[in-house]
Structures are given as structure tokens and as C-alpha cells.
Amino acid sequence: MEAPAQKAGQGGLPKADAQGASGAREKRPEEPRPLEEDRAGSRPTQKGDLRGAAGGRTTPPGGGSRGCSLGVSPGPGTRHSAGTRPLVREPCGPTSSQNPELVIPEGLQAREGPCRSPARGGDCSRNSCLAWHRGAPAGETPPVCDPCPERIQNHPRTQLCEVHTDCWPCQPGTGAPTCPRTPKPTSRGRNPLVEQPRACACGEAFAWRALRIPQERLQATEEPRPCARCGKRFRPNQQQQAGKSPPVCPECGQTSRPRPIVPDPPAQRLYACDECGKAFTRTSSLLQHQRIHTGERPYECAECGKAFVRCSGLYRHQKTHSAERHRRGPVLARRAFRLGCPPCGDYSERSPRRGSGAGEKPYECADCAKAFGLFSHLVEHRRVHTGEKPYACPECGKAFNQRSNLSRHQRTHSSAKPYACPLCEKAFKGRSGLVQHQRAHTGERPYGCSECGKTFRGCSELRQHERLHSGEKPYICRDCGKAFVRNCSLVRHLRTHTGERPYACGDCGRAFSQRSNLNEHRKRHGGRAAP
């Protein structure tokens, strides 16, 4: 180590300084000199530094080259910031053995080539790397200069991360600039220092650390955000870090980016029905629902007199009539037709739907040639031929081909009968049963047979009667193959195979498979027929 010391003395350093540096190495070989000792004497002032930069050199006003507190000789890229710990950047070429003022920490050897440091976790071959190992806090990585990959030591208390823009690599032993990205000096004769903003945990950059701290505190108070796949919650600083991709959820393996927390919608006011307790968000929906309990049907068809609870039901019903009854001109199919609401007298212009105008039935069944005005009606009808019953009752397992039939069947499992007759106080589980019962009081029979002219109170009774003329028997026994017109006839027939006798006499206890047989038996006892 004597040859480098003599070389440093010949290069322009005063002997006193060289001897002082040698004495410092003997007393404290592992610790650098305090920064306060070099602020007045050994470190060049900012004014002298600017004058040196203007001339392309960094020599202090005294003339000779002097080293800084870390023992690194000032070079073309060395610069000190006023009021803070000096930023040391060594050129890219010289190795640690060419700087006699640099105190090598224990565990590192002054040699040519790369060195291994466990504190940094990699190879280093430059004096700036050794300076960092010497004075950097444990576990902290030196910052990177923007134009070149040199590491520059930065004091931890420095609020601004100042980065040299005039940094260039140089050849070993020379000071000639060779980096093509070196900016030109400014008009004042110095190269500017760029403020490198600090990145917060959320990715937002702040130039001053004082602005970054309130942002970190604000993020610490935010609610955890759940993962979109597994629901596990993460804090914002765990979800998105500066310059890094979002973390991977350990439960589902998916990345979860921060999402804005959407507030819950305000609670809606509900209007409940006094009869059944069903709630609605609008009063108009509640009024329409109450007509089911009261039996009110204000919308009546002008052709057949059939009434409906809603105006939409009347509109769908009017399309079932023939086109001749609704046709009011030769160009009605190409123009809008007038739909009238008799209760309120409102008439609105509406255009017939494509393929389903007034009286038109474009959808025809391929099996029985029955036509329908809507495609959804054809789909429901096709289940009659295919035997598909996708709607099953969760109570008894009975399946149906339509959802409406399942809804009516589910009422049979409950004992509630909300539909009561105002004349005889007889109650029913469904609205259709109440309507057919009221026709028994009025004597109304709106459904007539086209073959024999017989009238019926309900549409289902008319369909069952028409099967007598057509000979259709859709209900077949699986045990013996016998067919029936009505489903109730098939149910009574199945009791002959199962032996079920649900109707028992209250006097003698004799049971029967049909209610009619029980009534005949009770007449022998002189009693009334079974209810």
C-alpha cells in the first residue's frame, strides 16, 4: 500500500493531507471520518465546484486535487450537494486498488476485478461500490444513476433524491468522457441536478418525502379490498406496490388489483300487501296485486267480454282474435293499429310485432299443425308431444311442462286459501278457482263447444269436452295401457292397481276408492253424503 500512497502525493495532494489520511487508517480502519470535519476544509465549496464545472474540471480553488470524506478523489462526475451528505459517484473504470484514500471494510480485498459482498448480494468492481459497502445502512440498496447503471450513495436523511445527469463512463486511468448520453453544460456552467420523485406504495410519485407520508397514512386507513375470486381481503399497500405487479392470492392463485369500494345502495321503501304480506317497491305494483284478492278486472275485451287485471293481459288477448275482427282497413297490417283500454278510455298507437300481428299465428307445430302467435307458446306446446316436464315440485316431486302449472300445484301443499267468495264465503287457493266458482252464482258459461254448442264455465272443462268429439285420450295407465280423457279418471283408475282406498265411512269404517261409492254407502246408513 506504500506505492499508491506515494503516487497520491505526487499527483497533487499535500503531504499533510496524505499523512493525515494515513493516520486515520491506522486509528480507525473500519469507520469513515465524520462529515462535519470536511465541510469547512477538505470538501470543495459549491461556488468553487461550479467554477470548476464551467471549465470542464472539478478542482477546488486551492489548485490541487483534494479527496472528500470518503477518500475518493474528485473526478469528472463527482459533485456535492449543499447542506446534505455528499453524493459520491465514481467513474466506471478505476478499481478499488487505485484509490489510496478509500478505507476498505473488513471482509473485502483491494484487488482488480469483481468483489463479493454479502451486504449487497452481488459482484462489484468499482470504488463507488466499496464506498457504499463502507457507509450505507444495512439492508439498503444504493440508488441508480439515470443515464448509466452506476450506483450512487445517498444519505438516508436527504429528502430529495438528486441524480447526476452529467454522469458518464470513462476509460481506466483517463478522464475523457465517452458516454453518448452525457448532456451539455447549462448557460451557468454547470450540469443540472434532477429531482427524482419518490414512489409511494400505491404507485403515485411525490418529489418530497413530506408529501409521501400523508399519502401512506391515508392508505393505511382504507378498508381492505376483497379478492375477486376467493373473497380474501388485502390492504391497498399489499395489493399494489410501486413498480411491481399485484400480489398473487395464496388461496386461488389469481392476482387482485385494487377496485373502488362501491357504497351500498340506499334502502328502498317497500309496500306490503295486507292480505298475503307480499311486498313491492312501487304503489302501482301493489294496486295491481290487490286486484288478485278482490277479483277486480278493469280491462275488458270489446270482442268477447273477457276481463283482465292488467292492460298488458288485454293486449295479449286481443291478438288471439282473428284478423278480420281487428282489421279496420286494407293497410292495417302495414300500419299501426289502435289499442283501446275501455276502463280508462286511453287509446294508443302501437305497431304489431314482427311475425305476430293482430290475428297472425306464424309459428306452427310440426306434429299437430296447431299455430301460435308467439314462439314461446310454441315451445311450451312442443312439450306436450315430447313429454318433457322440466319443472318439478320440491315437495312431492311431481313434474310439469309449464312454470305456471307448477305454481298452481305448489298452492295445494299449503293450507292457505287467500281467495274467498264474497257471496258464500267459500275460499280457494287459486284465483282461477274463485273465478269459476263465481260463475256458478251468476250462471255465466262463456266457453261453448263448436261441435254441439254445449257451454261450460271454464276453459279446461271445454277442452276436456272437445276430446269426446275428437277421441283423444292423452292420459294412459302405465300398468295396463288403458287411456282416459281426463287426468282425474286416470287417478281413480290407478287406485285399482295400488289398492288405495282414501274415502272411509265414519259410521262403520268401510273404505272406498272413489267418493261416489262412499256417498252411495252413506245413504244406506240414512246419513248425508260425504262433503
Swiss-Prot record:
It is found in: Nucleus. Keywords: DNA-binding, Metal-binding, Nucleus, Repeat, Transcription, Transcription regulation, Zinc, Zinc-finger. A zinc finger (C2H2-type) spans 271-293, 299-321, 363-385, 391-413, 419-441, 447-469, 475-497, 503-525. GO terms for cellular component: nucleus. Residues 1-101 are annotated as: Disordered. Residues 24-50 have a biased composition (Basic and acidic residues). Gene3D superfamilies: Classic Zinc Finger. One of its GO terms (molecular function) is DNA-binding transcription factor activity, RNA polymerase II-specific. InterPro entries: Znf_C2H2_sf, Znf_C2H2_type. It comes from the Eukaryota. One of its GO terms (biological process) is regulation of transcription by RNA polymerase II. Coiled coil: none annotated. Belongs to the krueppel C2H2-type zinc-finger protein family. PANTHER family: ZINC FINGER AND SCAN DOMAIN-CONTAINING, ZINC FINGER PROTEIN 397. May be involved in transcriptional regulation. This is Zinc finger protein 837. It comes from Homo sapiens.
